[in-house]
């Protein structure tokens, strides 16, 4: 069976995702499409708008054959680690092709750039460190400057969010298994971070979340496939954002010692001091980010760091594993064919997982479900089985 892998968040699953999924199957001639999906919290350092099980239902209803959870210790980190670990899982499942959307739209350029960076890794790292000498330069900007020095201005614009992820997927493939082929399609109609819906049927997940959180589900439904609309209408819990977790974060920052925060993943250069000061002044999470940010720290990096503090995530990340959230008959057939040759631990029943393997994931789910009206999902990692569909 020919397998295509995709890396997703489906926060929520919308028409743009449906287009991407259909193209992934069509252009790669895949027998099975496997999605590695973020769980309770996502890469920008935010809570997912609805629980991972509801989003897995959306994926399966739309035609994904297998949904595998990207562990929270990787799903909530910067693009390098996010991509490396997603590719590690997909490689372990033996995909043939990695398919992604990008602003650039030419897979060969991603592969070329990744090969050159691997071949010139020492020089590339040196250029990054040189750019970081300026204390006001963020790591993302330093990375972009080093990339431009190596390739010039025209090969890839890695300031674009999907291009940078695509580049890191290509880099991970080159380092882990260059036999995996890459395919990409140009992202159309809506930019990744666009906050307003401006196209008849396609809008960014950011714009769709904004509508849903404002109580405009019917308006948001113009940009969602019917299966996603049904799941959202039947969902009985709250639609979530940082607003729901602000008081928990504020408490953590106020009660924790500076030394304790220094041991949290992503905390460096004294950022915990700014965060602790901001926590005593901010009225809400948006205020907190405004009070904390500097030229060196992007909003996304601050959100990720705040999330690691909320989750009490220690510097050492968990080991990778394959956690099945759901699959259809095709996905089940594929898993049964390859199960013996998969090198990572496969988790379908959490209570039977190796001790400690899912510790960070379980804690993240418990914190995610502290919000009212999520009682049905509390300890869900234990009592909600993988979704199996026909």
From Swiss-Prot:
Chief localization: cytoplasm
GO cellular component, one term: cytoplasm
EC number(s) reported in the record: 6.3.4.-
Catalytic activity: cytidine(34) in elongator tRNA(Met) + acetate + ATP = N(4)-acetylcytidine(34) in elongator tRNA(Met) + AMP + diphosphate
Locations listed in the record: Cytoplasm
Molecular function terms from GO: ATP binding; ligase activity, forming carbon-nitrogen bonds; tRNA binding
UniProt KW tRNA processing keyword: yes
Record's keyword terms, sorted: ATP-binding, Cytoplasm, Ligase, Nucleotide-binding, RNA-binding, tRNA processing, tRNA-binding
An annotated GO BP: tRNA modification
Binding residues for ATP: 7-20, 101, 162, 187
Alphabetized HAMAP family for the sequence: TmcAL
Family: Belongs to the TmcAL family.
Function: Catalyzes the formation of N(4)-acetylcytidine (ac(4)C) at the wobble position of elongator tRNA(Met), using acetate and ATP as substrates. First activates an acetate ion to form acetyladenylate (Ac-AMP) and then transfers the acetyl group to tRNA to form ac(4)C34.
Protein name: tRNA(Met) cytidine acetate ligase
Source species of the chain: Listeria monocytogenes serovar 1/2a (strain ATCC BAA-679 / EGD-e)
